Regions:
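Single conserved hydrophobic/aromatic residue that forms the stacking wall/gate
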Residues: 1-7
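Fe-S-dependent hydro-lyases/dehydratases of central metabolism
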Residues: 8-207
Length: 207
């Protein structure tokens, strides 16, 4: 743990005897943000040859911890999208999987399919889940992480199960447009998303 971002953060705060597990730190957003996407079994296709919470910062093409890259993108005002495969979000600690994603500045997740509870939790955090359709996926789109991705039409609002156009601009200048399925499945979920998440929805209905 002494080489991880979480370990470094806790060393700074003088708690080396109390590291314990992520589960014991679920109330500490600084720890949990740094732990999001940090599972040692994760292999980020943007950063080949690495395991765990690493990515490649663009346009510098620099391999670095995901959290550090997020901090840099926030400075630049760059919104983030996660691209995933099948059953995206499967695993334990599902609530923090969505909370951490939100805190890292992710606006949408585009995947081949979603684990049921995680899809719902993403919406509860105000994150838009989109699903690839028509046999399109990250591999046949040849995505490497340097692309600029725009989701067309969301500024005008979305509806459950809408088909939304995603525009992908490659470094070469090539532009591809694909259809995706909006995985906001119900009117209640739509209200949560429109309000920026379930907590904001509840607060606005209380005031």
């Amino acid at each position: 743990i002494d080489v991880s971002l979480v370990g470094s953060e806790m060393c700074i705060r003088d708690r080396p005897k109390d590291y314990n597990s992520y589960g014991s730190r679920r109330g500490n957003h600084e720890v949990m943000m740094r732990g999001t996407f940090a599972n040692i079994r994760i292999k980020n296709e943007m950063a080949p040859g690495t395991e765990g919470g690493f990515t490649k910062l663009y346009p510098e093409e620099k391999i670095m911890p995901i959290y550090d890259a997020v901090v840099e993108y926030k400075k630049r005002g760059t919104d983030l999208i996660v691209i995933g495969g099948k059953e995206y979000g499967t695993g334990s600690s599902r609530d923090w999987a969505a909370k951490g994603t939100k805190l890292l500045g992710v606006k949408a997740v585009i995947a081949e399919s979603f684990e049921r509870i995680h899809r719902s939790n993403l919406i509860g955090m105000g994150i838009l889940p989109l699903q690839f359709i028509n046999d399109v996926n990250r591999k046949n789109l040849k995505l490497i992480g340097s692309e600029l991705i725009s989701i067309n039409g969301i500024e005008n609002g979305v509806n459950p199960s809408d088909h939304l156009t995603v525009e992908i601009k490659y470094l070469s200048g090539e532009i591809k447009k694909i259809k995706t399925l909006c995985r906001i499945d119900t009117k209640n979920e739509l209200e949560y998303y429109k309000n920026g998440g379930i907590l904001q929805y509840v607060l606005r209905n209380m005031i």
